[in-house]
Amino acid sequence: MKIEKLIPLPKDKVRFKLSSFKSVPKEAGCYVLATFENDILYIGLSNNLFTRFQQHLDNPEKINPTKEGKAIWFYFTIYDSKNLPKLERTWINQFDAIHGRHSILNKINSPVS
């Protein structure tokens, strides 16, 4: 699934590499790791996008190529922390509806309160 099919669309993007970390805000939000062609590899949420971006760069599973491509883009939307699980679940459900499964790097269902 291409990033362009997500509703709502993530508002910002940076390259998924260390030199981009200063461009990521220290705010709550939902994010997507995507290939150069904008294919979704991972959907997540964080109360601090800046910290989460750096954590993912330290995770070999997130930085190494998958059979569906390599994470090149970090798309994100700053979002109210109370509603983060709902937005993440919405995006995951949209992906699941098209592919019948989670994105390749999403292993478990996120909780929704």
What are these regions (language model features)?
Residues 1-51, 55, 82-92, 112-113:
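GIY-YIG nuclease catalytic motif and its immediate N-terminal context
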Residues 41, 74-79:
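A short, exposed loop/beta-hairpin motif centered on an aromatic-Gly-Thr core
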Residues 52-75:
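A broadly used, surface-exposed interaction patch
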Residues 59, 93-98:
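A structural signal for alpha-helix termini and helix-coil/disorder junctions
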Residues 70, 110-113:
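Alpha-helix boundary/capping detector
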Residues 97-109:
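Coupling/hinge elements of helicase-like and P-loop NTPase modules
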